[in-house]
Design a protein with these regions (language model features):
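An alpha-helix initiation/capping motif
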Residues: 10-13, 33
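Interfacial residues of coiled-coil/leucine-zipper alpha-helices
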Residues: 2, 6-9, 16, 23
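A secondary-structure micro-motif
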Residues: 18-196
């Protein structure tokens, strides 16, 4: 029927757009090997925490590899099976998770470092920041590579605003994610070309 055809067409157009973004992403990440995959499961009760993709160890996916959708990082592989992998999203509220170490260039030319956390209603921010006030709105935030879990230079998002934490000791820098966290259907798992 016509309604089903229109719905399917709309779904295919959205997937096509995401595939085009994945191709664009591949051109910019020349220092990495990219494993493209599709999201096959995302439960309502863990919507902001986890999703399952259709690529696993057979495709070369390993634990802790970063995952991108659209133009930015959306999470990290936390569990790998032969044909599927579980991805923990950067919006997870799990306090025990490994956080992404990030950096941004301040107006004074220095690097500002922090760790990705979730503040408020699924809003990502980088916290434990000393010089956050020197970051302008729109400044790009990238993975720093510190801690060794993620390669350096993958886009997380852009600075939305900076505030002081409740103790007045450090800054909380809210980030507008570059990645498609709402409803990704196509993802790119990022693998270093030269694996240690």
């Amino acid at each position: 029927n016509l309604a089903q055809t229109k719905a399917r067409n709309s779904s295919l157009e959205a997937e096509n757009t995401q595939l085009k973004q994945a191709l664009k992403l591949k051109k910019t990440l020349t220092d990495y090997t990219i494993i493209n995959g599709s999201v096959i499961s995302r439960a309502a009760d863990t919507w902001s925490d986890l999703l399952i993709i259709d690529q696993g160890s057979r495709a070369g996916v390993k634990k802790n590899m970063p995952v991108m959708a659209g133009k930015g990082v959306i999470g990290r592989v936390v569990e790998v099976n032969s044909t599927t992998s579980k991805v923990e999203l950067i919006t997870t509220t799990d306090k025990s998770t490994n956080k992404f170490a990030v950096e941004a260039d301040a107006a004074n030319g220095k690097k500002v470092h922090g760790v990705i956390s979730v503040v408020g209603n699924n809003q990502i921010a980088f916290t434990q920041v000393v010089d956050g006030q020197k970051l302008k709105k729109g400044t790009r935030v990238y993975t720093s590579g510190m801690g060794g879990l993620s390669p350096k230079g993958l886009l997380i998002g852009t600075v939305k605003k900076t505030t002081r934490d409740t103790f007045g000791l450090s800054d909380v820098v809210e980030i507008q994610p570059a990645g498609n966290l709402n409803d990704p259907s196509v993802v790119s798992v990022i693998k270093r070309k030269v694996e240690e």
